[in-house]
């Protein structure tokens, strides 16, 4: 199959495919109830037409008329559905010979002509359709150009780490510390996650790319990432999740929740693997993202045991790993607020004590949870 997009000099646009087309009965069933498909928020809506309704309706933002012409591979005459912005439509059939498949014809309003300038139009077309599984050709002034990559490197099983890092740097205009693959059963999410090379705050929204059935959905993470995963940038495609009616995000349901849980486990498995097999990379990530690693460890006892010795804590003798703090004494002295720490640090230094400043987010929680898991340790709050 293929998709051909024709941008004419008068800015008329034709989207044409060589698919199986629609019979008159199917045109009537689907197009005359155009809003219906956008309201079906169940997997049953995942049929061969798909959830196209709101997408076709959105054409009325830039045009007063939508024309759909189709001829079915199952036989019958070609049909033409012409919808008007006032809600009326006309459905006709034609004995005229036309190729099997469908095409959508749009005549843009004057106010939106700027979107149909060649460079702007091509940028939008590439942005949304770059990884569609069928070749997309843009035709303009007798020239034809392939504008997508049906087999993108980030979905290629044999792509190397360098290829994935180079692709991410090109797409996001930023390098990454590392990259790893994910695949979920829930929602059939597949792609790669990049580890950001700079510190991030929980309130900052990073740039992502989320595709739904290989078409760009959003540059937000669409709630696919756990709340603590702000050090991760995702480049993923979901074949089994549902979009909202506006096609700006994913429907928040149990399927999305399960997919997010699987992605969270994949991130934890990745970090666990680094601790066991690539300590140098783990240390690089820890240097930049120790705050987020602490957040992960605070909610997962297994990872707490695995990560705790490597996590940095401020003490009156400088920043030290918990492993070095623990090796100094089985009694760990700490303060729970910054003012107390400032008051005792000089006295503690003179007495030769090691005192942890646990005023930072997660630090006291981590100390208490680790002590509960390791009875040989004693916490002494000063």
Where are these regions (language model features)?
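GHKL/Bergerat-fold ATPase module in large chromosome/replication-associated machines
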Residues: 48, 67-90, 109-114, 119-382
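GHKL (Bergerat-fold) ATPase N-terminal catalytic module, capturing the glycine-rich phosphate-binding loop
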Residues: 1-115, 316
């Amino acid at each position: 199959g293929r998709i051909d997009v024709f941008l004419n000099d008068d800015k008329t646009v034709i989207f044409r495919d060589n698919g199986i087309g629609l019979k008159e009965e199917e045109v009537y069933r689907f197009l005359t109830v155009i809003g219906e498909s956008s309201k079906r928020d169940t997997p049953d809506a995942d049929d061969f037409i798909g959830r196209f309704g709101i997408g076709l309706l959105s054409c009325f933002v830039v045009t007063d008329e939508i024309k759909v012409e189709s001829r079915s591979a199952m036989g019958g005459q070609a049909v033409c559905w012409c919808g008007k912005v006032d809600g009326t439509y006309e459905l006709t059939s034609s004995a005229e010979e036309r190729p099997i498949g469908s095409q959508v014809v749009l005549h843009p309003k004057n106010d939106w002509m700027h979107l149909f300038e060649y460079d702007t139009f091509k940028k939008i077309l590439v942005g949304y359709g770059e990884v569609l599984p069928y070749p997309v050709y843009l035709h303009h002034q007798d020239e034809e150009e392939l504008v997508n990559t049906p087999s993108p490197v980030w979905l290629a099983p044999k792509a190397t780490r360098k290829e994935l890092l180079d692709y991410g740097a090109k797409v996001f205009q930023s390098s990454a510390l590392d990259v790893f693959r994910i695949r979920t059963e829930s929602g059939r999410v597949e792609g790669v996650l990049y580890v950001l090379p700079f510190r991030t705050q929980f309130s900052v929204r990073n740039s992502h790319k989320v595709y739904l059935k290989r078409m760009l959905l959003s540059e937000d993470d669409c709630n696919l990432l756990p709340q603590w995963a702000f050090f991760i940038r995702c480049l993923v495609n979901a074949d089994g999740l549902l979009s909202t009616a506006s096609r700006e995000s994913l429907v928040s349901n149990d399927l999305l929740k399960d997919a997010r849980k699987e992605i969270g486990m994949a991130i934890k498995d990745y970090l666990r693997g680094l601790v066991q097999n690539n300590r140098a990379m783990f240390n690089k990530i820890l240097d930049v993202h120790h705050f987020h690693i602490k957040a992960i460890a605070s909610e997962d006892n297994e990872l707490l045991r695995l990560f705790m010795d490597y996590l940095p804590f401020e003490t009156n003798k400088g920043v030290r790993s918990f492993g070095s703090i623990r090796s100094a004494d089985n009694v760990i002295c700490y303060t729970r607020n910054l003012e107390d720490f400032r008051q005792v640090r000089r006295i503690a230094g003179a007495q030769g004590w090691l005192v942890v400043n646990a005023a930072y987010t997660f630090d006291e929680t981590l100390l208490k949870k680790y002590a509960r898991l390791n009875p040989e340790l004693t916490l002494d709050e000063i």
